[in-house]
């Protein structure tokens, strides 16, 4: 893996190297977010994949690609798998979780809209390098109940997103059951569990602060691709 595919985060008394084989993300898993996107809440989980190459950790910057004119933030609770999971029932799902952290599902919204209009997958809008910031630490699954945590995001000090994980349509055990009946989840794989309402555009020079109760907060600068190219 290249260096952007591996992020080292504090975990227990040491560190954990985040090296997923895949990032499985949820679309429209908060009802109000589904509505702000012009949809009704789904009847079953809507999943898509983000590439591990999109991962960055604290201290890195989110890069706005020249190809997109509208890049949005989405703050999400990330579940990191601790054991190989295949056909796991919801009743046993928590036994397979290593821990929790925060992930941003950065999205090129204009490219997503174009892809939807053509009936194409969303990968082009979700897969750019730096489009999966993660941090600030991994919290042991035994030390945190993820069922009702405040989750939020500020841009330049102003609150954009604020919700609670209890507002998820499909809860973590349901997600693990659903996903593991489709694909095997390997140790280290990440499930990004969806975002509360309030998603919005990012611009060059913005400063993002994202937080989840019990995990902490992380901050990232936003830079236009043109500003870092020679």
Swiss-Prot record:
Family, similarity comment: Belongs to the FAH family.
Entry's Gene Ontology molecular function annotations: acetylpyruvate hydrolase activity; metal ion binding
Keywords, comma-separated and alphabetical: Metal-binding
Residues the entry annotates as binding a divalent metal cation: 74, 76, 105
Source organism, top-level taxon: Archaea
Short name of any one Pfam family annotated for the protein: FAA_hydrolase
Organism the protein comes from: Pyrococcus horikoshii (strain ATCC 700860 / DSM 12428 / JCM 9974 / NBRC 100139 / OT-3)
Official protein name in the record: Uncharacterized protein PH0643
């Amino acid at each position: 893996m290249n260096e952007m595919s591996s992020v080292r985060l504090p975990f227990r008394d040491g560190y954990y190297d985040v090296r997923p084989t895949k990032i499985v993300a949820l679309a429209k898993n908060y009802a109000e977010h589904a509505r702000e996107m012009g949809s009704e809440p789904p009847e079953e989980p809507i999943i898509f994949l983000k590439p591990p190459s999109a991962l960055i950790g604290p201290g890195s910057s989110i890069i706005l690609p020249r190809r997109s004119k509208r890049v949005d933030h989405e703050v999400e609770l990330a579940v990191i798998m601790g054991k190989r999971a295949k056909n796991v029932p919801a009743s046993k799902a928590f036994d397979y979780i290593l821990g929790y952290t925060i992930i941003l599902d950065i999205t090129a919204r204009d490219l997503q809209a174009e892809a939807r209009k053509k009936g194409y997958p969303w990968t082009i809008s979700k897969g750019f390098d730096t489009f999966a910031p993660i941090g600030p630490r991994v919290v042991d699954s035994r030390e945190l109940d993820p069922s009702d945590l405040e989750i939020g995001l500020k841009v330049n000090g102003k609150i954009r997103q604020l919700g609670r994980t209890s507002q998820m349509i499909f809860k973590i055990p349901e997600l693990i059951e659903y996903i593991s009946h489709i694909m095997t989840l390997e140790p280290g794989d990440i499930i990004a569990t969806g975002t509360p309402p309030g998603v919005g555009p990012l611009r060059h020079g913005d400063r993002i602060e994202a937080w989840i109760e019990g995990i902490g907060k992380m901050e990232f600068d936003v830079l236009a691709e043109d500003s870092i190219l020679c």
